[in-house]
């Protein structure tokens, strides 16, 4: 079956669902059959499903569809486990499996792993997702999409086995940032919320009052202060990969009612999830050691910079003075990496600076629409005894 035939068959039944598409002709074909404000096009490989997942978590009463590819889902299989563990019933992931990297052009193509023994549907089931369907006809595709849109029994993953035919329908005249604005404004209008905050105040008006911070006592731990700082600055969505320096904070986030915490197996996955959460109106933060920043480079550059999406990054400074592990040596590249990546940051060496730095970082990223990093010195995250 052809991809565009699948799209044409379901386009008329899509109403207010939000759609995230992958690259090239997948995006172009969906735009050709249903050009709508609720579509975010051209999301990079390995990021489509994380974006859609984050969006579904931010808007639990709204159906979200991901049009991913076999190459894209194979790029980050760990997102399937995250979906299974969290179970958003409003999420439908469609993997358009043509067994190759085909949609990028008119020339010869390279086969993907799904052309061999890799069974994407089997991987999804083994990850813990119950509603997994592999379809080979347009009628079957229409049926499982309809069931996913009408049901609420958990997330759905559909493997649509398409051929390698493409409909060259022309490309979009929008770049990522224009598409982002259109998409977010549509969500603001239909969800009655404010997401974009380019200015903190009207001209001539005083600045918005600072958050009220609880006092810091001498025996307060770093983890406790960071958690309080997140709450007091109204951060309500946090992703993290377990890290000794952040263990106390993560434990508190897991128990908190005011914060949605999503554990991830890869920091880059978490960055993509945060992008989707922000698009849906959440105030997200990603907690990771600085080596995790390196692992997130692709997602930050290909995603957040392409679309202009802010994110508060809170990082432990591995390789800083006091480091005791040999693998921390590469940490001294952190600040040059941040500068080269054009990520604004603040280095924190005093616990009393932590809460205000979260406040200031959120303000900066709201008008800058770019990631902001709070880099916490190693002696604060892992104080030595004595």
Where are these regions (language model features)?
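Short glycine-enriched loops at secondary-structure junctions
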Residues: 22-26, 44-48, 97, 241-246, ...
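N-terminal alpha/beta PP-like core and its mobile active-site loop of ThDP/TPP-dependent enzymes
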Residues: 90, 198-201, 206-385
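Active-site diphosphate/adenylate-binding microenvironment
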Residues: 1-45, 222-231
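Short active-site oxyanion
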Residues: 15-18, 39, 130-131, 234-238, ...
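Thiamine diphosphate
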Residues: 3-8, 29-181, 283, 302-339, ...
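Glycine/aspartate-rich loop-and-adjacent alpha/beta segment that forms the canonical ThDP
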Residues: 3-4, 35, 151-213, 256, ...
């Amino acid at each position: 079956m052809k991809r565009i035939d699948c799209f044409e068959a379901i386009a008329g039944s899509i109403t207010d669902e939000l759609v995230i598409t992958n690259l090239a002709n997948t995006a172009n074909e969906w735009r050709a059959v249903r050009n709508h404000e609720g579509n975010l096009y051209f999301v990079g490989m390995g990021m489509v499903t994380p974006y859609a997942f984050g969006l579904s978590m931010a808007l639990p009463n709204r159906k979200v569809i991901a049009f991913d590819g076999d190459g894209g889902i194979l790029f980050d299989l760990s997102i399937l486990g995250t979906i299974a563990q969290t179970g958003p019933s409003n999420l439908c992931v469609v993997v358009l499996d043509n067994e190759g990297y085909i949609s990028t052009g008119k020339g010869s193509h390279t086969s993907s792993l799904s052309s061999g023994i890799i069974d994407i549907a089997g991987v999804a089931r083994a990850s813990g997702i119950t509603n997994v369907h592999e379809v080979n006809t347009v009628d079957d595709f229409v049926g499982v999409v309809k069931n996913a849109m009408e049901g609420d029994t958990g997330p759905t993953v559909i493997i649509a086995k398409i051929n390698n035919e493409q409909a060259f329908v022309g490309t979009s005249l929008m770049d990522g940032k224009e598409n982002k604005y259109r998409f977010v404004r549509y969500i603001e209008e239909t969800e009655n919320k404010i997401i974009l905050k380019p200015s903190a105040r009207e001209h001539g008006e005083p600045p918005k009052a600072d958050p009220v911070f609880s006092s810091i006592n001498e025996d307060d731990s770093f983890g406790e202060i960071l958690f309080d700082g997140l709450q007091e600055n109204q951060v309500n969505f946090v992703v993290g990969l377990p890290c000794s320096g952040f263990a106390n904070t993560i434990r508190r986030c897991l128990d908190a009612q005011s914060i949605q915490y999503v554990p991830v197996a890869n920091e880059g996955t978490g960055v993509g999830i945060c992008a989707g959460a922000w698009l849906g109106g959440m105030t997200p933060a990603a907690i990771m050691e600085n080596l995790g920043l390196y692992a997130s480079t692709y997602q930050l550059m290909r995603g957040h910079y392409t679309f202009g999406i802010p994110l508060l990054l809170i990082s432990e400074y591995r390789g800083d003075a006091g480091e005791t592990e040999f693998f921390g040596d590469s940490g001294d590249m952190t600040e040059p990496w941040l500068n080269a990546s054009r990520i604004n940051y603040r280095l924190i060496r005093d616990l009393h600076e932590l809460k205000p730095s979260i406040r200031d970082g959120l303000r900066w990223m709201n008008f800058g629409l770019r990631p902001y990093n709070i880099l916490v010195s190693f002696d604060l995250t892992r104080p030595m005894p004595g």
